[in-house]
Amino acid sequence: MGFLTNEKLLIVGAGGAIGSNMAQTALMLGLTPNICLYDIIEPAVHGVAEEMYHCAFPGANVTWTTDPKEAFTGAKFIISSGGAPRKDGMTREDLLKGNCQIAAQFGDYIKEYCPDVNHVVVIFNPADVTALTALIHSGLKPNQLTSLAALDSTRLQEQLAKACGVPQYKVTDCYTYGGHGEQMAVFASKAKVDGKPLSEYNISEERWAEIKHDTIQGGSNIIKLRGRSSFQSPAYQAVKMIEGAMGGTPFTWPAGCYVDCDKCGFKNVMMAMPTTIDATGVHFTEPQGTEAEMADLRKSYEHLCKMREEIIALGIVPPVEDWKKDNVNL
């Protein structure tokens, strides 16, 4: 079996549903034979490793560990789904604080054990701020760390396809930018359906409102239908992001990236932008949209700034002016 690279891929949180799906997807796509599965829960990660062995992927060299030093040392590519899910009785602040503390430790492990890592993808929520926290603590350059944001755009693509009665792949140029959550900005003014402008389909204001709602609530709908949060789609898209970073097919769905751009008017946040991930890292361009779309993006950015200030107030990351003390690349 041919592989894209032989470099070590570390999957953090590998004992969970997302992590185990990432391991299998990476092997099925032939990204690398050398995959390390890491989790703090020994039986779960051990079980995932056994499943991968039973798949009998030719040439695969799958290892597992609960020791962070063993896991992170030598890793060149990392995907982390290692956050904690929201549980009954937890407030939003509980989730924010808990997962950002996990993200801070994750970043510290990178700085200590694998500072030469090529690319890192963070996918545990709230992804915009967990990724920002990890970046600050890791010491990495901004183009080396991204967060998962593509699902919002693929959900928009699905909703538009259903509304227009076409296969999903025939809907193009529809994206969501800004935050990963209810404050996301939906950009569809340049969308095309089977090569035709979306405007030719005369979607009513009421139907458009439904499309936006169903896009934003796409993750919640999965929970209602399946009784648990998404795991197959985030696993697949995260692995495709790493594939781009490994030098495979560039990843062109929006990704969360560090933005400090005077021209855009967005400063010191992680947010979804028009991006490409390739072997040189992640690169973003300025979003282009209608006045209303850009206004929604500004609102989303302002919400991200508030979340950033929350983790600063919690002491998880320092004030913006002190970030260079932890990461000279910011």
Predicted segments with their positions:
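C-terminal substrate-binding/catalytic lobe of Rossmann-fold NAD(P)-dependent dehydrogenases
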Residues: 138-144, 153-330
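Rossmann-like NAD(P)(H) cofactor-binding subdomain of soluble oxidoreductases
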Residues: 91-159
